[in-house]
């Protein structure tokens, strides 16, 4: 009986080796992936102080680090907006020199460069005793009455002076003002009995501080000057006229005394400067004979009341008067600065040619 053929002997039913190769390939792939993963993760291992470690991946940074970065960026932004203010050196004694009235229209840098090393302060004329304004004022009343004589370059000159290392004093004649007084006789000026503007021995005119328009004009000018950067404003001629035919002055319409009118103007000025955030000194100039006498009827000054609104009082005096004026000023409890023709040996002073 013949046997049934079943194919090649030993090979027809064996499949074990092919399955083993697939398993080995999968195992090798897993090992390779694990090795690559370990090498990748090794870059992000953070070891703690106790020897343990943790993984810190870029996409999972702690919140506090992101916050720190934001804060750092914010600080950088603040630094970009930072404004640096350079403070002037503190001045103990004011050793000032009055610059020429033409300094704002000339070479102010040369004027400062010509000062001696002892000088640490300068005084600049902004408005004179005729009412003329030495800078390009924007006050409408000053423009309308023709008082503005300073050109556009005067602002740059002022900025150069106030931006220097010198302590700066702006000098302003207040009530001795021919321009505005003539333009506004009835509303602002000291007038004659006839109603026409009064004039003194030099044929110049004065503003009447009991009149609202006069106070408003002076306040506008002083406030404008305060915004130019001066460390101090020195008010001059802040009184009624002292010379001339006083009997011809019209007084019957006054609603307050001369002293009260001066104090009202001083109060208006102080209030306006406070509102304008002016942080400098406000000072006033007084003649030596009034200081020594304590008061004067014609001017309307009573020293004990007059000085209350001011930080310093400047007094023009000779070397012979200096000792007695210094002694008299002690009674008023306000800082005193003599105005001299030459520098003093010590203390504060203003040299005026």
Enumerate the language-model features and the residues they cover.
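Aromatic- and acidic-residue-enriched segments that line the glycan-binding/catalytic groove
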Residues: 136-145, 177-198, 241, 245-253
């Amino acid at each position: 009986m013949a046997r049934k053929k079943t194919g090649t002997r030993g090979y027809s039913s064996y499949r074990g080796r092919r399955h083993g190769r697939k398993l080995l390939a999968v195992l090798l792939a897993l090992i390779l992936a694990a090795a690559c993963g370990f090498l990748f993760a090794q870059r992000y291992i953070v070891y703690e102080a106790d020897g343990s470690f943790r993984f810190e991946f870029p996409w999972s940074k702690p919140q506090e680090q992101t916050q720190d970065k934001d804060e750092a960026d914010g600080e950088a932004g603040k630094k970009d907006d930072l404004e640096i203010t350079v403070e002037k050196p503190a001045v103990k004694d004011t050793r000032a020199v009055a610059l020429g009235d033409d300094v704002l229209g000339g070479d102010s840098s040369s004027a400062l460069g010509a000062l001696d090393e002892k000088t640490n302060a300068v005084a600049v004329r902004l408005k004179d005793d005729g009412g003329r304004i030495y800078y390009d004022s924007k006050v409408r009343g000053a423009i309308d009455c023709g008082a503005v004589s300073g050109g556009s370059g005067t602002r740059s000159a002022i900025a150069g002076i106030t931006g220097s290392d010198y302590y700066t004093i702006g000098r302003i004649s207040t009530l001795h003002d021919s321009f505005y007084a003539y333009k506004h006789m009835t509303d602002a000026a000291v007038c004659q009995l006839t109603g026409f503007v009064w004039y003194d021995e030099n044929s110049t005119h004065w503003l009447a501080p009991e009149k609202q328009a006069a106070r408003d004009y002076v306040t506008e000018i002083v406030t404008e000057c305060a915004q130019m950067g001066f460390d101090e404003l020195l008010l001059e001629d802040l009184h009624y006229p002292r010379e001339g035919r006083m009997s011809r002055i019209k007084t019957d319409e006054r609603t307050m005394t001369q002293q009260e009118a001066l104090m009202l103007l001083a109060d208006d000025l102080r209030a306006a400067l406070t509102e304008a955030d002016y942080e400098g000194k406000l000072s006033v100039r007084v003649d030596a004979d009034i200081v020594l006498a304590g008061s004067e009827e014609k001017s309307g000054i009573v020293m004990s009341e007059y000085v209350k609104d001011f930080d310093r009082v400047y007094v023009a005096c000779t070397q012979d008067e200096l000792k007695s004026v210094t002694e008299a000023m002690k009674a008023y409890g306000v800082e005193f600065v003599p105005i001299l023709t030459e520098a003093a040996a010590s203390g504060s002073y203003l040299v005026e040619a």
